[in-house]
Structure formats: C-alpha cells, structure tokens
Amino acid sequence: MAGELRGSRGPLQRIQIAPREAPNLHLTMGNWLVNHWLSVLFLVSWLGLNIFLFVYAFLNYEKSDKYYYTREILGTALALARASALCLNFNSMMILIPVCRNLLSFLRGTCSFCNRTLRKPLDHNLTFHKLVAYMICIFTVIHIIAHLFNFERYRRSQQAMDGSLASVLSSLSHPEKEDSWLNPIQSPNMTVMYAAFTSIAGLTGVIATVALVLMVTSAMEFIRRNYFELFWYTHHLFIVYIICLGIHGLGGIVRGQTEESLGESHPHNCSHSFHEWDDHKGSCRHPHFAGHPPESWKWILAPIAFYIFERILRFYRSQQKVVITKVVMHPSNVLELQMRKRGFSMEVGQYIFVNCPSISFLEWHPFTLTSAPEEEFFSVHIRAAGDWTRNLIRTFEQQHSPMPRIEVDGPFGTVSEDVFQYEVAVLVGAGIGVTPFASILKSIWYKFQRADNKLKTQKIYFYWICRETGAFAWFNNLLNSLEQEMEELGKMDFLNYRLFLTGWDSNIAGHAALNFDRATDILTGLKQKTSFGRPMWDNEFSRIATAHPKSAVGVFLCGPRTLAKSLRKRCQRYSSLDPRKVQFYFNKETF
C-alpha cells in the first residue's frame, strides 16, 4: 500500500515504476569528487599534517641524543607521549576556529563571488569541528596510556637496586642545581598516583581529560537533541580544558640533557662508563638535565585571541535593543516572533541566535530566519522541541505586559544564501525544517512584484514533508500568495511545489480520495494536492535531470540525517561527469 502511495499524483493513485538500473560506482565517485574536491583536499591536508607532526616528534624523541638517558628509563613510551602531545596542541589550535561564527560569515561574504566549490568547505564547519574533537580524543588516549607506562617505569627505576643505568639515573642530583634531576619520582616510597596528582602536569592532565570526556559525551546527538541545555552548559568546560592545556607543561616532567652537559659528557661516550661518573680522574661527568619548556600556549594563543574577539562581538551585538512587533501562535505549537533591531541586515537562509534572559541568562539557541530581506522586520518560527523552547512559548502565551526581553546575535550565513546562484533550485524541508525556505520563497515573491531582472534562478522545485496536517497551516498563506502572483505574471512554471503527509491514516486518505475532483486540496486549500507518504526521489531526480539537461541544480535540505544521506546519493548518481551537462550540488543546513 505504501509503495503505491509514495510519490503519487493523487492521494490513492497507483503508479507503475520502471525498474532502475544499478548505479555506476565509478560514475558516482567521480561526481562526488567533482563537487567536493576542495573539501577532500582540505581534509587530506589536515590528516597529512597530523601524520607529519606525529612522525616528526616521534623520531625526534626516539633518536635525539638529548633524550638518550630519558629513553633508558622510559623506552618508546617517551616518543609516543611527546608525539601525541604535539598533535594535541595542533588540534586544540584548530578546534576553536570552526565555531567562530562571525569569522566564518566574514569569509563567506568575502567569497560570495567565488566558485561554489570554494565556499563549500565553509558549510562543513561543524563537521570539521567534530572531526578535530575525535582526533583530540584519539591522541588523548595515546598520551595518557604512554604516560601511565612512563610513570610506572619511573617508579620501577627509582625502586631498582641492581645498579643499572636506569637506577643510577633515577638517583642523580646535582649539588649546585636542585632541579637537575631526571626521575620525577624522588623516593622509592612515592606511588604513581601521588606523583600524578601532586605534579602540575598530572593534575592539569586529569582535569583536562575529565572536561574533555564530559564535553564529548554530552555532545552525543541524542543528548544534544533532547537535552540541549545539558549540552550547552557542559560544552563551556572547554574553558577549563584550554586553561589546563596552557599550563600543562609548566612542571617540566619530561626532561632532557642540557646542551652544556652534552658537550661535556656525550651519552655515546659516557653511557657505558656510568659507574665512573663520580670519579674525578675520569673524563665523564654525570649528566645534567632540564625540563622541556611549555609550548602548548604558543599553539592556542592565536585561536584564543580570535575566539575572545568573537565573544566580545557577540556580546556587543546581543546588547542592542530588540523590539518585538508581533507574536503569532500557529497550529502544531509553533511560535512566530516578528522583530526589529537597529542596523539589522539579512540575506535569505541566514540564522540568528536567540536568548531570553528571563528563562536563562546563558542559553542561546539558533533559529533560521523566516522573513525576507525585503521586509521591514525579521522573524523566526519556533517549535516546542525542548525545555527552553517550551518555556519560551509558554512565556509568550501568557501575554504578559510588557513582553519578555529578547536578545539576538546574528545573522549568520548558511548554504541557503547561495540558492539564487543556481539556475535550478530544489528545496527540501522536513517538518519545521521548512523555515529557511520560507525566507527564500518570500524573497522570490518580492522579486517578482518588483520585476527584478537580476534573478538568475529560472526554476524552483519545493518539497515539504510533514507528519501532521496542522504543520501545513502557517505556511499555507505564503504558498497561496505565491500561486496567485505566479498566475498573474504568467509564470506558473517557475515554482513546482509538492507537499507530503507522512502521518496520515485511512480516514484522511479516504476523505481525500472522495474529494479528489475539487479544485483545491481539502487539507491545505491550495491548488496543488497533498501527496501521502514520502517522495520517490529517484523519480523526482530523473524528472529534474531530464527537464534541465544542461543546468546547475542546487539541492538544499533542512532535515534529518537519513534524508540528507538519501539526497546526497541521488545528487551524485544523477550528476553528469561532463561539466556542460546537468550537475546536482547538495547543500545541507547545519548550525
């Protein structure tokens, strides 16, 4: 039954679908590379830098004469700990950049006239942020395990009574330099736990690791979607992580032989005669050691400066007065806020962060703008999807006077800004995910009213997938206005829209079938009839590719990950390797 209903032109009309040929894997991969080569190049460069830094540091600590005696105690674990530490510094430097929203918006604006491929990496900022976080976790595990081995070997060397080189090195001290030691465990009775929690490196390492674990676990999609407040507050532990990282190396636990000592007693000449180091008649003296200077702060200083400037700018913009001009409660528990703010300027598809101090002083939530740039106000539609949004809707439903104060930060750019750069645009919204396309469709309505000849887009396909009929209500007026405007201008072919209801039952379908001959849809009142089920995307993409054989088609989605995966595959499958023929470019809203 569902297979008969999906993608049907009428509510219960059976359609015959021709069997589809299996996709060509080489063609699909080729199309993917054509669309994402710059993102791939950036990702490969980042991975390559991680590999280079790890190998460089590993070989340095594994082969350098400076750490010859340190390796006598610690072995290869020394090189593993230091190599992973260098990569941790590098990735900790990188992780803040993708979340500097104002910097990314500036870069997007600067690249507005660039090729769409050059802008695409900016659209994956959060994906890159997550990848860097995963890399930090991997190197943290390597670093911790290596140092656990190191501390255990320090302890064993200190307790050893066999007269080996490691035991002699562990008991070394210099009468003129109190810090000229090599083994941080200074007493045979000192435990590994005591040494770890009483040293700067050990204590800051434990605190930074706990902060990292809490941030990563609270960022899981289930928690982020259902307990956003927990994710939001816990993620601010990055401040603790950064501070601990910056001072982690102050203790100088990892020590190497000083340059002066290397000149006097080179390990290649003196390591085999360590029993004669204290013999004044011999040529070898016992070596002197110094701690490795802290370097983490050098890596993170620049991104911290960027981020501090970002937060100052956010704070300044959030303090500007916001005037709420209209509040509308739509069906399906959707709140519309229309607002004004001095100096506010937006583009289609952008989003803002909203804060309501009476609910939470610290929580900022992102919402796509549903107004058009041509309107005198900016608006958002907010669906109850968590404690904060439910409290906000409840606050405005109570109709207190004066209205609660709202703070706004933004707007910030997204992939939807590029919609008018394509000859053909395919807009796909799921549920409240239709909001960025409200802005686009409103802007089109204004452009047609003003006879804007600069509009590059020649055709728009709009798909909206909803679970319940009430969700269509707030959008009906806009679609109805667009229908009338297109009809009056003789451009009915410009917009092709399809509404899909997934939460239907037999009563709704039967009622729709009985009234199928009506001029307007019984659910929405629009001329375009509502379809039941989900779109058959292969049919839709094949139809679009046939209708526009030489066009660049931008596919824009605001919806769940499963739908994104499906559409991304279709874009790759139905694009031609010949740049002169149809090309589908997939774009997904992420903020």
From Swiss-Prot:
InterPro entries in the cross-refs: Cyt_b245_heavy_chain, FAD-bd_8, FAD-bd_FR_type, Fe3_Rdtase_TM_dom, Fe_red_NAD-bd_6, FNR_nucleotide-bd, RBOH/FRE, Riboflavin_synthase-like_b-brl
PROSITE patterns per the UniProt record, alphabetical: FAD_FR
Modified residues (Phosphothreonine): 457
Cofactor: FAD
Residue span(s) of domain FAD-binding FR-type: 317-418
Gene Ontology biological process: angiogenesis; cell migration; cellular response to hyperoxia; extracellular matrix organization; hydrogen peroxide metabolic process; intrinsic apoptotic signaling pathway in response to oxidative stress; JNK cascade; MAPK cascade
Annotated ranges, domain Ferric oxidoreductase: 82-316
Cellular component terms (Gene Ontology): anchoring junction; cell projection; cytoplasm; early endosome; endosome; NADPH oxidase complex
Top-tier EC class: oxidoreductase
Residues reported to bind heme: 129, 143, 236, 248
Cytoplasmic side: 1-36, 98-130, 217-234, 445-591
Entry PTM: Phosphorylation at Thr-457 mediated by PKC/PRKBC positively regulates its interaction with NOXA1 and enzyme activity.
Pfam family, one: FAD_binding_8
Transmembrane residue ranges: 37-59, 73-97, 131-151, 196-216, 235-255, 424-444
Region span, Interaction with NOXO1: 424-563
Residue numbers on the Extracellular membrane side: 60-72, 152-195, 256-423
EC number from the UniProt entry: 1.6.3.-
GO molecular function: metal ion binding; small GTPase binding; superoxide-generating NAD(P)H oxidase activity; superoxide-generating NADPH oxidase activity
Primary subcellular site in the record, as a coarse category: membrane
Residues bound to FAD: 365-371
Residues carrying sugar: 189, 269
UniProt-listed PANTHER family: NADPH OXIDASE, NADPH OXIDASE 1
Protein's UniProt name: NADPH oxidase 1
Native source organism of the sequence: Mus musculus (Mouse)
